[in-house]
Amino acid sequence: MNSVHRHAKQTRRCDSRSRSVRPKPQIVFLIFLGSVLTTLIVTARPATSNSPFLPNDLPFENPSGSHATFSTTGSIDLTNEFFQELGTNGRRCDSCHRPEEGWSITPEGLQERFQKTGGTDPVFRTNDGADSPNADVSTVKARRKAYSMLLSKGVIRVGIAIPANAEFELIAVDDPYGFASAAELSLFRRPLPSTNLNFLSTVMWDGRETFPDQTIHFDLSDQANSAITGHAQGQSLTDAQRERIVKFETALFTAQIHDRDAGELTARGAKGGPVNLSNQPFYIGINDIFGDSKTGAAFDPTVFSIYDAWKGVSGHGSDGARAAVARGEQLFNTKLINISGVSGINDEPAFGNPLVVKGTCTTCHDTPNSGNHSVAAPLDIGLTDVDRRTPDMPLYTLRNKTTGETRLTTDPGRALITGRWTDIGRFKGPILRGLAARAPYFHNGSAKDFQAVVDFYDSRLGVGFTGQEKADLIAFLRTL
């Protein structure tokens, strides 16, 4: 789960981690495709254990096909603390990180839980699940209203105060739920997936769980504890509990395994799916835009190579769909984009403060076959600007204490951690694998589907995608 811990500066650092893959245990019982987690407490057992588990590569249906998770431990252990109630309000880590929903949550899944429980499932708690912690939840009708943002966009309310040392002050609040103030802004954010964590360079959207001179393992341990004390309203975890949760999480790799049009994503030499992903090397700074942190090699914009084997495929049906995926991958790697107005790039001294940077999608999504930024590099791509505000989002007016400049934003982002004016609206770029399972997209759930994501970038950066290019990009994103 995301935490409400407030702290930390980001840093660029090297952190290599090794992985070993163990063989899968024998599966004794079959599990039906598409069942929710509560019906997937598998009674299959390896020879050496009586613990229930989910088998590796169990497919879960999603709108684009199906995804699966591979654990380097051989199976997904449902007795881990990740699946235990460690707080006081009934929540568990998997309340907001469900394998059938890409280890996040979706509006569809949340609406199903609401219908089954009348809005009393542990995910529906006022401390951060409701639009306001003061919301009326006395009746089913009241709960449906109170949890409207969670139900419609799959967003959790994160409460963070304006830092005491901030370069700015809050001078106006427009909160449709009547709660937010300088003491606690209401920030509606999507829970990040608790899988593929070996590719992380930054923990949390705003990096508040990324600590200077520490490993990602340390950061995740602190995040797990913050989640229990915050979201689950419990006591601090023991060191052993933290370690077991992090060990469980960092063994997980999730990716799409089947596309409704292209078919199996390992067919004809393709390298889709979580098993291939688990063998992908990573370290902090790999293929960084300013040069690889270990080898010093220049940045390679060809970040994705999963579907290279499908280049040149022709035909109809699944072969035609595979050709579209390969074209989309190439577009992601090579389509020229004139990047402008992006804080963290165009106002970044390391780039020379250029008005325009000629790049591609991979300028920001540079981690090979994962797609996040391989170093801590939060960016403001305009998602929190006032002209993108919807009526269900709070709006904050901030004023620079030195210059008097004002800015309206729905979420100050990284600035609430650092206090820096230039960090307003900056967020990390997430890992791009397993996307099809966990719409909506962006930190605030503002893009309901892949079409909305591509349309946003096309409009925001003036890319000028053709209709065919948009379709090919979407075909590629669906298969990740």
Question: Can you name each region flagged by the protein language model?
Answer:
Residues 1-24:
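N-terminal secretory signal peptides that target proteins for export/translocation
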Residues 5, 41-44:
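Short, intrinsically disordered, low-complexity terminal segments
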Residues 12-13, 27-29, 283, 472-473:
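Intrinsically disordered, low-complexity segments enriched in glycine/proline and serine/threonine
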Residues 14-16, 35, 79:
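Residue-level detector of transmembrane insertion/anchoring sites
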Residues 17-20, 31-33, 372, 477:
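Enrichment for repetitive, rod-forming helical segments
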Residues 25-28, 120:
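N-terminal leader/targeting signatures
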Residues 28-40:
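Bacterial N-terminal signal peptides
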Residues 45-480:
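Periplasmic c-type cytochrome electron-transfer domains
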